[in-house]
C-alpha cells in the first residue's frame, strides 16, 4: 500500500482494493514535479513470488507475477490516466483450488479501462458446482483445460462488446441438465470462443444407449448475453448411428425451474452474477437441432435414414421436415409438442408413403385399438394424417383427446381372419370363405373424435364380394356400421377376378343391407338392416351437428 502512494489518487484507490500478504520487490522511477496540478512521470516495476493476493474477485494463493506500471505509455502524449497502463507477465496462482496461468495481462487507458489477457487453466469440472451454484447444469465428473484470450472493457459503465478467443477442451465429462433431468456422459470435445461467437466442435456424448456427435454455434453470444439472452439461438448439427427416443423421454415432463443455489460462501457477487447468467441463458435461449441418424428406435418402432429439424424453446418442441424410412416406405412429419400444466398438447401433420401396413401397426402398437390389428391386415399403406391430442410424461396418448382426419389408401390389401367380416357369412353368403380375402385399392377419409372413428362411405372390392361400408367405429362407446352388399355378388368370384373399384357413388342396384354393431358382450354382431337404421342414425347425427342450436352453442363457447 505504501507503493500506491506514488500514484495518482484515482489509481491509488483502485490498487488499494488489492492486498499482498508477503513483502515484494518494487522499483519506482518518479521524474518531474509533484506539486499540485503537476503529474510527474511514474514508472513502477514489481515482482511478487509465492504470495497470497486478496482481490475483488476472491483470494489467490501461491501467486507469482511481474508487474509494470507507466503513466506515459505513449511518449508523444501527456501523462494521464488515459495514457497509463498496467502490464503483468509470468502470472501464476491458485484461485478456489483452480490453477491459473497468464503469460500476458494488460490493462490500458485507466479512464475507460481495456483489458487484454490470456488465461490457461486445467481442473476437474465438479469443482465448478460449489463455486458457481448454477441451478440448470451440474457437472458430475470429467476434466477441463482451457486456453482463452480476452479483449474488452472492465467497467460496467463501458458497453463496448468484448472479444473472446480460445478453446475449452472437455474430457470424459458427465453433465446433467437439471430442468429436464437429462444426463450426458462420456462428453469429450471442444468449446471454441471465436470473437463474439461460441462454437461447439466435435463434441461426443452419450445419453443412455444413444451416442451423439455434435457441432454447432451460438452467434453474437457476447453481444446478447447481458442484453437479450432470449434472442440467443444454439444451432447444433447432431449425428448418431442410433437414437433411442426413450433416452429423451424426460422432454415430455414439465421443465423444472429452480432458483440458483448460493455459490460458495467466499465467492463474490461477480460469481453469483455468472451463475445467474448461465441459468438465464440455458432457460431463455432457443435450441435448433439438425438431426441425422442411421437408425431411430422407440419401443417397437424402427426407422432408418432419419433426418429432422427440432426447435426447442422453454415451452415447446417443434418438429420440422422430419423424414424417415420406415417399413419399406417413408414417413414425413411436421408438428409440435406444447407443454401443459398436466399433459402436453401434440399436433402432427404426417404423410406415410407405401409403408407395410402390418409392420406399421406393429410399430405403433395397433394405435391403441384392438379392432383391426397387425395380424389381420396386409398391404401397402399411404396416408395423410392431421391429428392432435394430449400426451402424458410417459409418452402415452389420451385416446379421448384425439381429434383429426386421416386420408388413407391401402394397395395390395388382404384381410386375414378379421372377425367382423367373417361374421358376415353367418348372416349372408354362408358358403363363402371370409377368412382370407384380397381387396382392390382401399381409400377413405376417417374422421377421428376421441375414441370414435367416423368411416365415410368406403368401397371394398374384394376377392369374395363387393361391399360398401360407412358409419361409426368406436372401441369404447360401441361400433355402428352400415354394410351394403349389392346382389351382383351372388355369383362366386374365381382366382382370375379383377379387383377394380367402381367408385363409392357408382350404381349398385338391388342390395342386401347389414348392420355391424357392438353387442353387450363387447363383440361385433352382424344383423339384417333392410331399413338402413345405421345409416339413418348417422344422417340424423350429421343434421344435429349442423342445426342452428348447435351453432349457437359453439358461438357462445367462444
What are these model-predicted stretches?
Residues 1-93, 98-196, 210-438, 465, ...:
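Membrane-proximal interfacial segments on either side of biological membranes
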Residues 394, 443, 456-457:
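Short secondary-structure capping micro-motifs at structural edges
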Residues 448-455, 459-466, 470, 474-476:
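Extended serine/threonine-enriched, polar tracts that run as long, contiguous segments within proteins
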Residues 293, 441, 454:
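Active-site-adjacent structural elements in folded domains
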Residues 439-446, 451:
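Generic long, charged, amphipathic alpha-helical segments
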